[in-house]
C-alpha cells in the first residue's frame, strides 16, 4: 500500500483530469458489458420471438418494438451494436487524450523535480554516485512511472470494475452458473498476486543490470581517448558483453516465469469456459435458461476471464513501477545541500585563516585527510601548496569552496566563520579552476561565458588573451564559434585548462584557486600566463596548487602538505635552504631541466 501511495503521489495536481479519464473509462466498460445483452435479445426475442427480458437494454430496444421482427429486427440490433461501439470509441478517444495530458504534466513535474533535486545534492553525493545510474533513473525509471500513471493504474481500476459489474450481470441471468464461473476466479487472482510478489525482485535485478550497462556505455564513451590510447577496446567490448549477457539472462528468467504463469492461467481459463458450456448446455436442455442466456453467459465468462488475467499482467507491470518509484525516491530522499542556509553575504576581500582544520571524507571517517592544518593568507597575497598525491591539497581548497564541511577547527574569511556564510555566495566569490576542467559540448565562446552569460564578446576575448589562448582560437576555422565537442574532446589538455582559466577570470572573484590547473601547459606558456595574471590580478587572493616548482616559486608563501599535515612553510628561498620535501623536488626538477 505504501508503494501505491508513493506512485499516486506523482499524480498530485492533475487529480481532476485523471478522475475525468477514469469516468470515461468506466462508462466505456459499461457499454462493453451491455453487448452480450444485445446478443441475448437478438437470439431470444428477435430470432426466437420471445418477450423482451427485463433490464435497461430491453427498455432501449423496446423503443423499436415495431421493427423487431424478421430482417428489420436484425438490422435494428446490428445498428444498436454499431451505435454502442461508436459511443465506446468516443469515450476511449476522450479517455486517451485526457489521460495523456494529465500524465505528461505529472511526468514533467516529476522529471523537473528529480533533476532539480540532483542539482542540489552535495558534492559528496556526486563524488560517489554512478553517472549512468543517475541517467537511468531520470529516463527509464521516469518512463516506467509514466506508463503506470497513463494506463496501468487506470486499467487496474477498470478491470476490477468490469469484474464486479460482469458478476452482477451474470447473477441476474443465473446464480448457479455465476458461482461456477466465480469459483475459479479467486484462484486466478491469487496466483497473479503471488506471481507479482515474486517477480518484483526479478524486475529490480533487471533494472540494476540495465543501469550497470548504461554506466559501462557512459564510462566508455567519456573515456574513449584512454580506450584508444591503451588499445583497451577489446577489454571494453568483453566487459560490456558480460553485462549485456547478465541483463539478457535476467530477462530470460523473467520471461520464463511469465510463460509458466500464463500457461497456468490459460489452463484455468479453459477449465472455466468448459465448465460453463457443459453446465449451461444442461440447463438449456432442461429449459431452465434460454439459448440467448447461454450465449450471453459464455460471452460474460470470456469477458470475465480477460480482466482477471489482465489484472495479473497489470499488477506485474505496476510491480516494475514500484521498483522505479523506489529508485527515484532513493534520490529524492537524499538530503539536498542547503545552498543558502543563512543571509550572511559579507563583502569578500580575501583575508583567509585556517585554524586547526581537520577533515575526513564521509565514507572514510577513520582516515583523516587533513589533520590540524593552520595557515593564513592576507588579501592580495598568493599562497602556493605543494605535496605528494593524496596529501590533502585538493581537499583543502574544496573546503574553502564549501564543497565539503570540515570536521573541526575554524576557517575564517575576512573575520567571518566560513560555515556561517551562504554557500551560494561564497562560491560566487571563489573562482575554482580544476586540473581536469569540464567543458560543455558548445562553442568556445559559450564555454568562456558560462560563469557570466551576459558579458560582452570583447571581454571574453580579453581574458582569453590573459590565458594565452586567443591566438590558438583564432587559428580555428570558426574561431570562437568552434564547437569543442562533448567534454571538450576537440581541444588539447592545455587548451582546456587555459579556457577554464579564462572562464574563471571572467567571474572577477576576489579569491582564485588554481588546482594544478597549469599542469598540461609547457613551461614557457606557464611563465607567460603567470606573468599576465600578475598584471590582471589586482588585489585578488590566489591559491596555487602545483607539482611544478617553477609555477609556485614566486608565491608570497608556500606550504608543503604531507599525510594531511603541514610539514614545511615559507618562501621559495627559505624552503630551498632547508632539508625537506620541497628541496628534494626542487633539486630533481632543476637537474631534469639542466639535462634538457
Task: Give the label of every model feature segment.
Residues 17-30, 151-205, 278-289:
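Transmembrane helices of ABC transporter permease
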Residues 169-186, 190-192, 253-326, 331-332:
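Helix-loop-helix
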Residues 13, 123-124, 140-149, 153, ...:
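An intracellular "coupling" helix at the cytosolic face of ABC transporter transmembrane type-1 domains
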Residues 1-35, 39, 45-81, 87, ...:
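Membrane-integrated ABC transporters
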Residues 347-596:
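ABC-type nucleotide-binding domain
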Residues 2, 11, 99-100, 117-163:
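Juxtamembrane loop-to-helix connectors within ABC transporter transmembrane domains
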Residues 47-51, 104, 111-136, 140-142, ...:
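Short intracellular "coupling" helices and adjacent cytoplasmic loop segments at the cytosolic face
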Residues 26-34, 82-93, 145-148, 152-164, ...:
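Hydrophobic alpha-helical transmembrane bundles that constitute the permease/transmembrane domains
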